[in-house]
Amino acid sequence: MSGRSPRLISVKRIKLPQGYTKLSYIESNDGEYIDTGVSVDATNYNKLKFVVDCEILGSSGSSGTNWFLNGSNTNGAYFYTGQYNGTYYYGCGGSADQNTGISVVSGRHTFTLDAANKKFTVSGVLDITATVANVTATARLILFGFSYTTIRTFRQKLYSAQIYQGETLMCDFVPCMKMPNQQAGLFDLVSQRFFGNDGTGAFIAGPAA
């Protein structure tokens, strides 16, 4: 042994404003969702980067048969990550569902769709070149579900999510509990805003972080 002291690894600590408690995750039960307030459209789609750290739990009533997606599945404005029938899928522009052919590995993963660099990755599972098509419509990016003809939802634990436009961080979502009414949702560190449930039911709060 060299006798050296062990190297300390710094951990970024996220401090939320007074009245909020940081959570490890929040969980939906197929009815809850969050509208991020960010739209994909013809002017920005090729600059967007969408990062979702989550565990997809499935059991969908409203999302359609085995479609478990975060983002937009609106015709002409596909921009999503997720899975269908046990296979990883993504959509990046236009109206084409992109089948990776890679089987889903259960558990927590970070999904990243980076249109600017034409990359789609799922942590520890896949890293591929993304097919990017033109966007001809406008649609909101959704968490715990996806925009379609209506909003479709599914069961999921979400640990964090970020949206970039080019090098600009537009949203940085952290799971939290809003006091005093103990409302679980996401706090955006960029806008300093709380995002509560836009659907039915209520999010399940994970343990305090």
Where are these regions (language model features)?
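Extracellular glycan-recognition modules
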Residues: 17-89, 165-170
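Beta-strand-rich interaction surfaces with strong enrichment in secreted/lumenal proteins
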Residues: 36-38, 98-103, 131-132
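Short, aromatic/His-centered strand-loop micro-motif at the edge of beta-sheets
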Residues: 88-110
